């Protein structure tokens, strides 16, 4: 294998690694955002319980307004 071909293979590996890393990070952020929305919806359903409990009220002031 020539030096030019080895360099080309190296660049392809770096590019593939970067793309995979970028896509997995993006998927994690999207999944995390969806989980936060789901948690907020669940908390809003339990609003009376949470707002009357001091620790929950401090942790989630956005639902007790």
From Swiss-Prot:
State if Transport is listed as a keyword. Answer: no
UniProt modified residues of type 4-hydroxyproline:
54, 61
Coiled-coil residue windows: none
Q: Does the keyword Signal apply?
A: yes
* Gene Ontology molecular function terms on file: acetylcholine receptor inhibitor activity; toxin activity
Task: Give the range the annotation lists for the signal sequence.
Answer: 1-21
Q: Which residues carry this modification: 4-carboxyglutamate?
A: 49, 62
Query: How is this chain modified after translation?
Result: Contains 2 disulfide bonds.
Query: Where is the segment annotated Ser-Xaa-Pro motif, crucial for potent interaction with nAChR?
Result: 52-54
Q: In which tissues is it expressed?
A: Expressed by the venom duct.
Q: Note the pro-peptide positions.
A: 22-46
UniProt keyword terms in alphabetical order:
Acetylcholine receptor inhibiting toxin, Disulfide bond, Gamma-carboxyglutamic acid, Hydroxylation, Neurotoxin, Postsynaptic neurotoxin, Secreted, Signal, Toxin
Judging by the UniProt lineage, the source's domain of life is Eukaryota
Record's Gene Ontology CC terms? extracellular region; host cell postsynaptic membrane
Q: Where is this protein primarily located?
A: secreted
InterPro entries for the chain:
Conotoxin_a-typ, Conotoxin_a-typ_CS
Which protein family is it in?
A: Belongs to the conotoxin A superfamily.
Record function comment: Alpha-conotoxins act on postsynaptic membranes, they bind to the nicotinic acetylcholine receptors (nAChR) and thus inhibit them.
Task: Return the domain comment text from this UniProt entry.
Answer: The cysteine framework is I (CC-C-C). Alpha4/7 pattern.
Please report the name of this protein according to its UniProt entry. Answer: Alpha-conotoxine-like Am1.5
Species name: Conus amadis (Amadis cone)
